[in-house]
Regions:
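His/Asp/Glu-enriched, well-ordered alpha-helical/loop segment
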Residues: 58-86, 132, 153-154, 158-160, ...
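Histidine/acidic residue-rich metal-binding segments in metalloenzymes
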Residues: 1-160
């Protein structure tokens, strides 16, 4: 903590071992740090490359069920309840995951979560073999997208985060199954959020600032995310 560490993360690789996750939460809680997990059951994800459902079947793509994410979220929320540690769910995409987070918050578990702009504006109906839309977690169904938006409205979701994962055009210019997961996010996040959430009247500007700046700083325990005398001039 003194050296500047603000959180513990698996860096995009799910912590499949429940005991390891328990220990991480126990030790991180000693330093008031959250554990950020890429929630995904590797055995359920398998070699999938798109959300498991009608559109993946039509395109002949191997699917990743929403349960691959929500099962891990349910586990981590339970471990957070057991240990008293702070769980932060990264780039949530499944309505089942949202239900697990809401249930945990209702029980007083220290759990926060985030959603990406692309999971708020796109669905698996957009795929059509476009490798630029291959990401992990994958684009989900309309019902999942709508649940994420509602989670922002009712306060269940704490943060909008980019999950910025760019790749060179040559890396994406291959078959869908062979392309790397990842999509750009930094340069599109604010315009998308303003266009789809502010200008439609879905969220207020103050709520958007909270989701993009204030709450991320709070989750990480940083003196940032606002403009106040004597505080760091850092709102991102």
């Amino acid at each position: 903590r003194r050296a500047g560490c603000v959180a513990v993360s698996d860096d995009g690789h799910p912590v499949a071992d429940s005991l390891l996750m328990r220990r991480a939460l126990e030790y991180a809680s000693m330093f008031n740090m959250p554990v950020i997990n890429h929630c995904e059951d590797p055995s359920l994800k398998g070699d999938g490359s798109a959300h498991e459902g009608y559109n993946a079947s039509v395109l002949g793509l191997r699917g990743i069920p929403g349960a691959a994410e929500s099962i891990m979220v349910e586990r981590d929320v339970s471990l957070g309840e057991l240990t008293g540690g702070h769980v932060h769910v990264a780039h949530m995409s499944s309505r089942g995951s949202l239900r697990a987070v809401q249930s945990g918050k209702d029980r007083g578990v220290s759990v926060t979560c985030e959603v990406t702009p692309h999971h708020l504006v796109l669905t698996d109906e957009s795929l059509s073999y476009d490798t630029n839309l291959k990401m992990n977690p994958p684009l989900r169904e309309v019902a999942d997208r709508d649940a994420m938006i509602q989670g922002l409205v009712d306060g269940s979701i704490d943060v909008i985060a980019t999950d910025h994962a760019p790749h060179h055009a040559d890396e994406k210019a291959v078959e869908f199954d062979s392309a790397p997961f990842g999509i750009v996010g930094i340069e599109t996040a604010v315009p998308l959020v303003l266009d789809r959430l502010l200008h439609t009247g879905t969220l207020s500007l103050s709520r958007i600032i909270e989701l993009l700046a204030v709450n991320p700083a709070r989750v990480l325990g940083l003196e940032a995310g606002g403009l106040q005398v004597g505080k760091p001039a850092d709102i991102t």
